[in-house]
């Protein structure tokens, strides 16, 4: 794309485009943002815009398309959603006043992770930008991870030092679900992470150069942002990796944003052990924030619990659901706050009424910092400030320690409210384009300019009358023409009475015309009043935004407290509406639930009776409930409801039960349902086994594990053997609380064989060949699988089910008396597999698998095979 022989404007375009080759450049020309060449081709295709051409001084016309500047956000949103970056090039001066070429410059680069426009954001979901820095030290990988929401100013970071660092990174990405991820070059070798991002997220991945993570760059960036004593302030040790991730994120914001980086005032550090571990599979299976089918909110735990009044509360609720606590003290602080709000019905109602008038001040403050807030948005901040005394008072009145703490955290922001109320009219315009936002009496010059605009003739009449009185010239008059502007005309007979302060401008046959400094000043005011008024109002509004920006820390702290109060009040409201109870949460390791219900299904079945069920799990006699019963009887619902009840308790919510005692669980693992992973080339059985393997590797004695129909994707004996082995491994090596549903009735003998296993089944009532699911879980194994009866309920033709009964009777009659269910599993325990050669064990223990290259791993495998063959032959 040659830059010679082009018009000055296009030369300017090329110079700016050269600085932003990877972004689509929105180039402001008058009332449009125009795109040229490759940008135009891309935008016209993605946005379905008409592609035209522009004469740029060369022989060929430049491909061009454009969008109106007043509606550009809609088009920009579509491009950003498709993973493009957009550089906004603005006119930096009024074209009417420009001398020569209008000055233009990039004011922002908008990327998926740096969006602040409310029209492009979901009000109930954070929009995170992530930064990951990893480093290998002493033979082990470590990582620093940072997540920041530019639209709210929140920033969170953690240090990861897990044996499987890739899995740990995926867990954090799953927790925050960023829309854009900055990575360091070594991250390209973490195929599990890059595969997860590619297959399970829509995040844009931005590879940052090694230079972005240099020590000097990190130190300078952190000092500039947080002060020279940043390590002490933020609590980072000398060898911490988080600062590198934070600094890379901040530098990226400096590159893309002209303003607003100062919105990030601090970084909240957390340890991954602070929160319950929830794998991507578990989050999907439990349908916490979106359904598996349709990816909708309705039908999720978030849908059931969302009784919030503010956008800030909605985002925080989602965050709490995605990050359940594991500290019993912190959990009980939330529960006590919910109990206080639940009991104080009047205070709760008043609090929720006040919260209903609170706007999204987190995101409003960011737009104020960027200078892009509208007068109405600033007025909304003022209206929110006006509600803070009521919010603070009602929270304090409830008495719970956490509510008192949050009430104390609320700053009434009286000075901010005063500034807004003093400066802005009660009903400000949607934007500053036509002015009219500044309140009368706030600025004398604004008042004068408005008076001049609306009453300029009055000013002239008053001045004319005063001049007549001062000079004694009765017929002195003030006139106007396009050549001289305003002038004073005196007839020839009174020219001797004209004072020296009058300057003669024109001689007429009938008299003289004069001007005075005062008249010219008034002329300038009248003729330029509207333009100067707009400029002055813009300046005063900018000053107001600047004064509010100085209080961002106070506003942010208040917004955080208000959001927490909103969620807690919502929990109390949900408990009241849905008949929830306060759980007893401790570190006992016990999970005892009386008449538990599935929180989502009971809401979906409004008007129908949901059958409640009890659960008893502990670390001794009841570590594993082995659940049998027919398909469709409710096994999966029962298991999921227990997982959801535990999770609800640990976010501080009351739970759907008559009573609940929840010993804190550090993680919930689920293996339910069956599906192929076609993208990864894995069969249903392979997916199932991979997920089970991850559970067995990562579960601890404090975890809750949900396993549904393990082994059904292969042959009966293979599946049964795998299921039995999994149960044994969990009970003997992990000891965690487990709900294990199976269609292998032969496994029910494990109650006698393995300590901690208890048989339960879903009760079924049978009449003839018809069955009724009672949905009630009872002790003991199921007496039948009822497969044919379920097939009949599903609608199989009667001829098919009748024939199935005939075949079943034939098979049962011909089966040996020693049925599969009577298999001697004890005999399996007596079978000893050949011992692994000690030489092989020594080699395996000595090798560091993570340091091997693919070739080294292959050679090592051949060496092991050779050792094994020699041992067997020997």
Predicted regions and their residues:
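ATPase nucleotide-binding head domains, primarily ABC-like/P-loop NTPase cores
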Residues: 37-40, 239, 309-310, 317-320, ...
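Amphipathic heptad-repeat alpha-helical coiled-coil/stalk segments that mediate oligomerization
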Residues: 210-225, 276-282, 292, 383-462, ...
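Active-site phosphate-binding and catalytic loops of NTP-dependent enzymes
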Residues: 112-121, 260, 396-402, 461-473, ...
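Terminal-proximal interaction/regulatory segments of ATP-powered molecular machines
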Residues: 481, 845-874
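Charged catalytic and DNA/RNA-contacting regions of genome-maintenance
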Residues: 2-340, 349, 353-369, 373-465, ...
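Amphipathic alpha-helical transducer elements in NTP-driven molecular machines
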Residues: 6-10, 26, 37, 66-76, ...
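Conserved catalytic alpha/beta cores of large enzymes that bind or transform nucleotide phosphates
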Residues: 173, 178-186, 518-551, 628, ...
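Charged, surface-exposed helical/loop "interaction arms" that form contiguous linear patches used
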Residues: 370, 374, 387, 405, ...
């Amino acid at each position: 794309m040659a830059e010679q022989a082009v018009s000055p404007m296009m030369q300017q375009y090329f110079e700016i485009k050269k600085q932003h080759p990877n972004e689509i450049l929105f180039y402001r020309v008058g009332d449009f943002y125009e795109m040229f060449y490759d940008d135009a081709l891309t935008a016209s295709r993605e946005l379905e815009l008409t592609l035209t051409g522009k004469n740029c001084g060369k022989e060929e016309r430049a491909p061009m398309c454009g969008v109106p500047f007043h509606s550009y956000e809609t088009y920009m949103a579509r491009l950003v959603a498709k993973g493009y970056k957009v550089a906004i090039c603005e006119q930096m001066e009024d074209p009417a006043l420009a001398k020569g070429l209008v000055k233009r410059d990039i004011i922002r680069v908008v990327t998926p992770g740096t969006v602040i426009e409310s029209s492009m954001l979901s009000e109930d979901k954070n929009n995170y930008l992530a930064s990951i820095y990893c480093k290998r030290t002493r033979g082990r990988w470590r990582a620093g991870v940072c997540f920041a929401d530019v639209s709210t100013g929140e920033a969170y970071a953690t240090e990861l030092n897990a044996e499987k660092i890739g899995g740990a990174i995926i867990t954090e990405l799953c927790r925050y679900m960023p829309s854009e991820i900055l990575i360091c070059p070594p991250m390209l070798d973490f195929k599990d992470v890059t595969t997860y991002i590619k297959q399970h997220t829509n995040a844009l991945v931005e590879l940052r150069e090694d230079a972005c993570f240099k020590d000097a760059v990190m130190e300078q960036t952190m000092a500039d942002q947080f002060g020279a004593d940043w390590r002490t302030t933020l609590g980072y040790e000398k060898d911490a990796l988080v600062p590198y991730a934070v600094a890379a994120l901040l530098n990226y914001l400096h590159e893309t944003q002209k303003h607003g980086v100062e919105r990030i005032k601090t970084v909240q550090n957390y340890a991954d052990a602070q929160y319950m571990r929830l794998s991507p599979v578990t989050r999907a299976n439990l349908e916490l924030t979106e359904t598996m089918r349709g990816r909708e909110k309705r039908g999720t735990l978030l849908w059931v619990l969302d009784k919030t009044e503010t956008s800030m509360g909605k985002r925080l609720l989602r965050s709490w659901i995605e990050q359940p606590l594991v500290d019993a003290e912190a959990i009980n602080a939330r529960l006590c706050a919910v109990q206080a709000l639940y009991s104080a019905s009047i205070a709760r109602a008043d609090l929720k009424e006040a919260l209903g008038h609170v706007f999204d001040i987190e995101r409003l403050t960011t737009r104020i910092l960027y200078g892009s807030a509208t007068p109405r948005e600033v007025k909304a901040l003022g209206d929110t400030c006006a509600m803070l005394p009521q919010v603070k008072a009602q929270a304090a009145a409830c008495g719970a320690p956490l509510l008192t703490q949050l009430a104390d955290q609320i700053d009434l922001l009286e000075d901010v409210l005063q500034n807004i109320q003093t400066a802005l009219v009660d009903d400000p315009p949607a934007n500053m384009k036509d002015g009219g936002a500044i309140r009368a009496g706030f600025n004398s010059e604004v008042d004068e300019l408005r008076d001049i605009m609306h009453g300029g003739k009055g000013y002239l009449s008053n001045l004319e009358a005063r001049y007549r009185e001062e000079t004694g010239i009765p017929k002195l008059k003030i006139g106007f023409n396009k050549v001289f502007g305003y002038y004073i005309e005196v007839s020839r007979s009174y020219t001797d009475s004209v004072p020296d302060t009058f300057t003669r401008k024109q001689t007429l046959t009938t008299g003289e015309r004069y001007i005075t400094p005062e008249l010219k000043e008034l002329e300038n005011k009248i003729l330029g009043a509207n333009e100067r008024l707009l400029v002055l109002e813009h300046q005063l509004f900018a000053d107001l935004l600047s004064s509010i920006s100085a209080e961002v820390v106070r506003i942010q702290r208040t917004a955080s407290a208000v959001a927490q109060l909103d969620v807690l009040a919502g929990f109390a409201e949900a408990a009241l509406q849905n008949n929830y109870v306060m759980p007893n949460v401790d570190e006992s390791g016990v999970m005892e639930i009386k008449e538990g219900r599935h929180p989502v299904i009971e809401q979906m079945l409004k008007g129908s009776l949901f059958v409640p069920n009890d659960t008893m799990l502990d670390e001794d006699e009841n570590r594993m409930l082995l659940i049998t019963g027919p398909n469709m009887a409710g096994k999966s619902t029962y298991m999921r409801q227990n997982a959801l009840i535990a999770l609800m308790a640990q976010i501080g919510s009351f739970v759907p039960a008559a009573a609940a005692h929840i010993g804190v669980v550090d993680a919930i693992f689920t293996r339910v349902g069956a599906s192929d992973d076609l993208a990864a080339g894995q069969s249903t059985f392979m997916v199932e086994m991979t997920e089970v393997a991850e559970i067995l590797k990562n579960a601890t004695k404090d975890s809750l594990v949900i396993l549904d129909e393990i082994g059904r994707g292969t042959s009966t004996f293979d599946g049964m053997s795998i299921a039995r082995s999994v149960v044994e491994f969990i009970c003997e090596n992990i000891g965690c609380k487990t709900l294990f549903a199976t269609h292998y009735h032969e496994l029910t003998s494990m109650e006698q064989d393995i300590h901690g296993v208890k048989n339960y089944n879903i009760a079924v009532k049978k009449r003839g060949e018809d069955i009724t699911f009672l949905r009630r879980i009872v002790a003991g194994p199921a007496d039948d699988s009822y497969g044919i009866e379920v097939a009949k309920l599903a609608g199989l033709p009667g001829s098919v089910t009748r024939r199935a009964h005939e075949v079943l009777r034939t098979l049962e009659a011909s089966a040996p008396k020693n049925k599969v269910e009577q298999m001697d599993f004890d005999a399996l325990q007596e079978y000893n597999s050949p011992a692994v050669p000690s030489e092989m064990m020594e080699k395996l223990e000595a090798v560091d698998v993570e340091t091997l290259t693919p070739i080294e791993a292959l050679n090592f495998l051949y060496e092991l095979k050779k050792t094994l063959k020699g041992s067997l032959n020997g």
